[in-house]
Amino acid sequence: MSRSVGTLTRADLAEAINRKMGFSRAESLDMVEAILEHMCGALRKGENVKISGFGSFVLRDKKERIGRNPKTGVEVPITPRRVMTFRASQLLRERIAKGG
């Protein structure tokens, strides 16, 4: 299976808004920035972010646990921390599986 690897950037999102919605490039970039900042703000406050038909950014608190240094084998404590995971919606998974 051959696939080219690319990266979708903020500028790409702004360009898509510019083309589809007719906003200026600056307005489009401001929209992208505002949306991302709103999402980051919600996550900072401990809220999960759900985008219907796309997926959810979910915060999880991980407890302290004992890990092991792979080089030395010495046990070391891993401190408690908050991690963010992304879970794609069923619709997004189906669209990706179909190639579009």
Swiss-Prot record:
Query: Tell me, what is an example of a GO biological process annotation in this record?
Result: regulation of DNA-templated transcription
Cross-referenced Gene3D superfamilies, in alphabetical order?
IHF-like DNA-binding proteins
Q: Which GO terms describe its molecular function?
A: DNA binding; structural constituent of chromatin
Q: The organism sits in which domain of life? A: Bacteria
Q: Which UniProt keywords apply?
A: DNA recombination, DNA-binding, Transcription, Transcription regulation, Translation regulation
* InterPro entries linked: Hist_DNA-bd, Histone-like_DNA-bd_CS, IHF-like_DNA-bd_dom_sf, IHF_alpha
Q: What PROSITE patterns does the entry give? A: HISTONE_LIKE (PS00045)
Q: One GO term of the cellular component aspect?
A: cytosol
PANTHER family to which the protein is assigned, alphabetical: DNA-BINDING PROTEIN HU, INTEGRATION HOST FACTOR SUBUNIT ALPHA
Entry function: This protein is one of the two subunits of integration host factor, a specific DNA-binding protein that functions in genetic recombination as well as in transcriptional and translational control.
Q: How does this chain assemble?
A: Heterodimer of an alpha and a beta chain.
Q: What is this protein called?
A: Integration host factor subunit alpha
Source organism of this protein record: Erythrobacter litoralis (strain HTCC2594)
What taxonomic lineage is listed for the species of origin?
Bacteria, Pseudomonadati, Pseudomonadota, Alphaproteobacteria, Sphingomonadales
Which gene specifies this protein's sequence?
ihfA
